Amino acid sequence: MAGKRSGVRITGETVHTYDLHVIAADVDGIVTAAGGWLCDRARAGWQVTVTVPPDRDVRALTILGLDVDTHEPALHALPGTAAVAVDARVLRDDERLRERVLSLVDAARAEVTVWGDPSPVGPDGRFDRVVHRLSAAARAFKARALQTTGQVAPDLAVETFVSAALWYPPDGADLMPLPER
């Protein structure tokens, strides 16, 4: 990791690279809720690393082109990463992690994206509802990954999240705000 210097943003002394660290409660949930977006990020050159609990079958994640880390706790990976994605169930159950993730948002240190019930991050306006439209490749890889987990492929065209600190340019964004209802 030390040799990587393909920075996308400089804030003060920190160079952020195209690194996305993902913290998931389980493999099935991440593939269903965020597999296409993560696959598209990996195919676009991001280093996507998923932390899942130990002793899980991670074949579906490797199909999506993702690296897997089964170390716990996942807090060690958060400093210096350009983006963090977290399962809302993990945020609900781990107060220390929730506080750490929200501190990244408050300090504008990283893009933070959450899938699932957004209530653990609060309704205070720091997070916006966003959507990712899956590429054809991501739809195909996600369908295969879902088969590996024994799940039936749902509508694979879009995935929705809540996200904060969208720092990349609007013309290159892969997470687009949802219109207000």
Question: PLM features: what roles do these ranges have?
Answer:
Residues 70-79:
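Short acidic low-complexity segments
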Residues 88-92, 97, 133-138:
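A polyampholytic, Gly/Pro-enriched intrinsically disordered region
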Residues 1-63, 68-69:
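Extended, compositionally biased accessory segments flanking or bridging domains
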Residues 2-18, 25, 59, 81, ...:
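Histidine/cysteine-enriched polar flanking segments
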Residues 109-181:
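Glycine-rich, aromatic-bearing surface loops/beta-hairpins
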Residues 57, 80-83, 103-107:
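Flexible, compositionally biased loop and terminal segments
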Residues 92-115:
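A short, gly/pro- and small-residue-rich
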Residues 23-27, 52-54, 85-93, 115-118:
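Structural motif
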